[in-house]
Amino acid sequence: FKGGSVVSGKGVRRADLLVEGEKVVSLGRGIKAEEDRTIDVSGCVLFPGFIDAHTHFDLEVAGTVTADDFASGSRAALRGGTTTVIDFACPNKGESLASGLGRWREKAVGKTFCDYGFHMTIDDWNEGVRAELPEMFAQGISSFKLYMTYPAMLLGDRDLYWALKELKTLGGICGVHCENAGVINGMVAEKKAAGELSPASHPQTRPPYLEAEAVGRLLRIAQAAQAPVIIVHLTNGEAL
């Protein structure tokens, strides 16, 4: 690739880029090599491939399925310069982690056009789930997601505490979807009773201060567990 502006960890500079196979092997001005193909990228910016670490492909949720499967989603990713996606393997409540991971691998294998990996959601906490975790790490799964909302997924404060402690012991990292499920459910019931069912009612049942409460509660639970935690997809400054 000749004449582009290359973005690296050291900044942006005009340079040529030589790629062999899937690897960058040389970066500089006036590279001379017996390359098979030269592409003039003058006026273009060359980035390393981006990583989207939070996708939901072919996910059945709320009576529907997310818009993209692994084929269409990975093609769209590549068009935007994303060369790796990390999706969420989502076992159903009562399903083993291994079974859920197997189903997600079946969704992806032979259909995905970019590199991919998996996080694992945990929607139940019991001895069986805890006992499966070492095998998940052996399978390459070291990042997990927990929910503080949605009836089929939420963990209570006690289970959040135990899950965070166990994942820290194993060397994993955990992301948490923070909402106050109880109050939201109450507000939703009030809106339904009043017949206020338009899209405008949705944010009214999820005010910023409730997300902030859930974030604060999670941080205290993580403090008690002495565990690191990631808070996923914040929506407002108060929660931040």
What name fits each language-model region?
Residues 5-49:
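Histidine-rich, glycine-flanked metal-binding segment
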Residues 4, 22, 77, 81, ...:
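Residue-level signal for inorganic ion chemistry
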Residues 98-115, 162-176:
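Alpha-helix-loop-beta-strand connector modules within alpha/beta enzyme cores
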Residues 41-111, 128:
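Metal-associated gating/positioning segment near the N- to mid-region
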Residues 131-148, 152-240:
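Histidine/acidic residue-rich metal-binding segments in metalloenzymes
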Residues 49-55, 85-87, 116-120, 144-146, ...:
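Hydrophobic faces of well-ordered beta-strands that scaffold small-molecule active sites
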Residues 87-113, 122-127, 134-135, 141, ...:
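Active-site loop-to-helix "anion-binding N-cap" substructures in soluble metabolic enzymes
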